[in-house]
From Swiss-Prot:
InterPro entries: MPN555-like, Trigger_fac_C_sf, Trigger_fact/SurA_dom_sf. This is Uncharacterized protein MG377. Gene3D superfamilies: Trigger factor, C-terminal domain (1.10.3120.10). Coiled coil: none annotated. GO terms for biological process: protein folding; protein transport. The lineage of its organism: Bacteria, Bacillati, Mycoplasmatota, Mycoplasmoidales, Mycoplasmoidaceae.
Amino acid sequence: MATNLKSIAKLQKPIQYDKVIEVDRIFADPAFIEQHRQRILASFKDAKESALYHELTHIVIKDNLFSAAMNEIVSYFEFQINPEELKNVVEGLKRDVVKDADEKTIQSIAEKIIKKALVFNFLQKEWKVEVSDDIVKRVISLYYEKTNQNVREYLDDKQKFEGIRTALIEERMVLETINHFKFHFNLTGQLPS
């Protein structure tokens, strides 16, 4: 999680975690699904198609619940986005992620990334979410057991070790965010107009 942000988020009122969030659509971006499919196959070469399908379905649902929860949480904050920080994120997106989108879309994605980081920093402190060295080592060991790939570089390289910790904190924050709300699915099957 980015902790040295120049942008600012100010909580305007207490977050109402007892609110039921309405989910009326499930979004599944083909590029997002393919990215996760490749990541899973790279880690678990012998993954059965049914297990892969189950995992991808789980990822899509989790992503949709998280997005709905974040849309709710963000409404409780006021943001001051630092222009230089926004420019850096936009440039990074253009270079590494979003190749064919228009400027307005890229700008919107960049703002969401910054807001998510700011909200995560706030909530991580509020919820006291931490990941110890022992947990990071255990996850690295489990990865080795499942894949038989060399993990020494993750144990010996402080930057890679901290990268694993950051990924684990982010995953815990996603799950905590989802678990703080109740959701109601109202999937009527209507096509967007």
